[in-house]
A protein has these predicted regions:
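Structural signal for interior beta-strand "rungs" in well-ordered beta-sheet cores
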Residues: 77-160
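Terminal amphipathic alpha-helical/low-complexity segments used for targeting or macromolecular assembly
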Residues: 1-81
C-alpha cells in the first residue's frame, strides 16, 4: 500500500489528494497548521514523514512551499495520467502536474512547481523552483519562468 504525507490541507491539498488516489496511493494524510483534521502541524514533518513512503508540499505560497520542500526526505512528483510529458522533458521532485497538461520536448520543470490543469510548458522552456503555471496558461518555447513566479490562468509567458 503506497502512502503519502501531504503538507497543506487547503483547496490545493485536496486536489493533490485526488491525483494521488488516481495514482494508487491508499494511505494519504495531511499536515496543516490551520485545520484540526490534519494529523499534525507542518513542524511535525521531521517526526511523521518516516511513517510514509513519500511526501509532497501542496501550499500555494511559494516561499512557504520552498521552505517546507527542503525538509522532505522522500519528496515525490505527482503527474495526472492525462498529462502528456515528453520523453526528453525533465521534471524534478516535488512537482505536481494536473490533468490535461503538456510538458514538451526538452522542457524543464524544477522542484516544487505546480503545473495546473490544461497548462502547456512548450519545448525548451524552463519553469524554475516553486512556480505555479495556472490553468490553461502557456509558457512559450525557450522561455524561462523565475523562481516563485505565478503565471496566471490563460496567460502566455514569453521572454525571448
Amino acid at each position: 500500500m503506497k502512502s503519502l504525507l501531504i503538507l497543506g490541507d487547503g483547496g490545493y491539498g485536496q486536489l493533490v489528494k485526488e491525483i494521488a488516489e488516481i495514482l494508487g496511493y491508499r494511505k494519504i494524510s495531511f499536515l496543516d497548521d490551520n485545520l484540526p483534521i490534519a494529523i499534525g502541524k507542518l513542524n511535525d514533518i521531521d517526526v511523521l514523514q518516516d511513517s510514509y513512503d513519500e511526501t509532497i508540499v501542496a501550499i500555494g505560497n511559494p516561499l512557504v512551499r520552498s521552505q517546507n520542500l527542503l525538509k522532505l526526505k522522500n519528496p515525490t512528483t505527482l503527474i495526472h495520467p492525462s498529462a502528456v510529458i515528453s520523453k526528453s522533458a525533465e521534471v524534478k521532485k516535488g512537482v505536481v502536474i494536473e490533468a490535461n497538461c503538456v510538458v514538451s520536448a526538452s522542457a524543464k520543470v524544477y522542484e516544487g512547481s505546480f503545473i495546473c490543469a490544461g497548462a502547456v510548458v512548450n519545448h525548451n522552456a524552463v519553469v524554475n523552483k516553486c512556480c505555479q503555471i495556472d490553468c490553461n496558461a502557456v509558457v512559450s518555447a525557450f522561455s524561462k519562468v523565475p523562481d516563485g513566479k505565478k503565471v496566471a490562468s490563460c496567460e502566455v509567458w514569453k521572454n525571448i
